[in-house]
Structure formats: C-alpha cells, structure tokens
Design a protein with these regions (language model features):
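Structural detector for helix-capping/boundary residues
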Residues: 13-14, 49, 175
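Hydrophobic transmembrane alpha-helices of multi-pass small-molecule transporters
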Residues: 18-22, 26, 150
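Glycine-rich, flexible loop segments associated with nucleotide phosphate handling
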Residues: 24-25, 35-47
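Conserved adenylate-forming
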Residues: 31-41, 59-179
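Conserved AMP-binding A3 loop
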Residues: 1-21, 158
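Conserved AMP-binding
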Residues: 42-53, 96
C-alpha cells in the first residue's frame, strides 16, 4: 500500500483479471454520468506511482483496454511538467498528491493541473473537509480502499455528499469479503 506497512498479499491471475469486467461498461456508465460539460469519452489517466505498485498495475490493466490514454509520470519532480505535456482527466492519487492538488486549488493555480478534474484517491483517509471543498468546486472525488488486497478498488466511496465524504464506502461488485 501507499501509506501503511508492506504486506504480503497473494493474488492469482483470476483475482487480477476479475476486476477488468467491473471496469468495463459499469465503470464507463458511472464516469459518463459525471463528465464535465463538453467532455467526451475516451478519457486520459495519469499515474505517478511506480509500475511495480499495485495501484499503477491496476491502471495499466484497466484503462487502455477501454481506449483511454494512460499517461505515466516517472518522477514526482516532473509531475507538473508531465501533467502540462499530457492532459489527464483522471489521476490515481496517493494522499500526498491529493493534498498537492488541493493546495494548488486554494492558491488559485488550477491552470497548472491542465484540466485534471477527477481524483481517484487510494489508501489513507483524507480530510473530509478538504475533499468536500474540492468536490464543491468541480472535482470528482473517488475514494478507494483495499486495492492491494483485491486488485481493484475493493471498497468504494463515490459520493460527493457532505455527510458521506468521510465514509469508507461500499464493496465493489467484483469482490467477496470473508472474515
């Protein structure tokens, strides 16, 4: 994961491919209902995480088959340069990146984000007030938990409502949870 201690999780090819069906039509329907005015599919996706990280691997396996451009940024020091060169609608966002986007928004530097409007937040719980402020100002916030264990989003919170912004969310359709 991006915020906790490393953990060994056994994933099979079946685990890894099961989520691809979920990312197909269902995900496209979900994202289509949230597109900014004038935006059309396919979209483009930015990831800054290394290729060996599970979240990046999910992006590599999920978005190109749907026809999306996958923009890879290899170094945090090149983030703004790469985002400026490669328009990205959506970004897989570790907590530090979400805070960076929020700080740009607060400082009036949204133009640096080159049209980025959807943040797919993973791992740690973020400040719900910060997420709500982003959501109220045109950003779509997706909170995902359990990616390492499920090779997908695991538990999702797609709501943009204030009372649910701090909730973990609901299980994704492709996941079975056993305690």
């Amino acid at each position: 994961g991006t915020t906790g201690r490393s953990k060994g999780v056994m994933l099979s090819e079946r685990n890894m491919c099961a989520s691809l069906c979920t990312y197909g039509a269902r995900a496209e329907n979900w994202i289509t209902s949230r597109l900014p005015e004038g935006q059309k599919l396919p979209l483009s996706h930015m990831t800054l995480l290394p290729l060996f990280h599970m979240a990046c691997f999910v992006c590599v396996m999920s978005y190109p088959p749907a026809g999306w451009a996958l923009n890879l940024c290899s170094d945090i020091r090149d983030f703004y340069r790469d985002l400026g060169l490669m328009h990205s609608d959506i970004m897989a966002s570790a907590p530090m990146l979400v805070e960076t986007v929020y700080n740009d928004f607060k400082r009036g530097r949204v133009s640096r984000l080159n049209g980025l409007w959807d943040l797919c937040c993973s791992s740690a719980a973020l400040d719900p007030k910060m997420l709500l402020e982003l959501a109220q100002n045109g950003f779509v916030i997706n909170q995902c938990y359990g990616m390492t264990e499920t090779f997908g989003d695991g538990i999702l919170n797609f709501t943009q409502a204030e009372k649910h912004m701090s909730a973990v969310g609901k299980p994704d359709d492709h996941v079975q949870y056993k305690l």
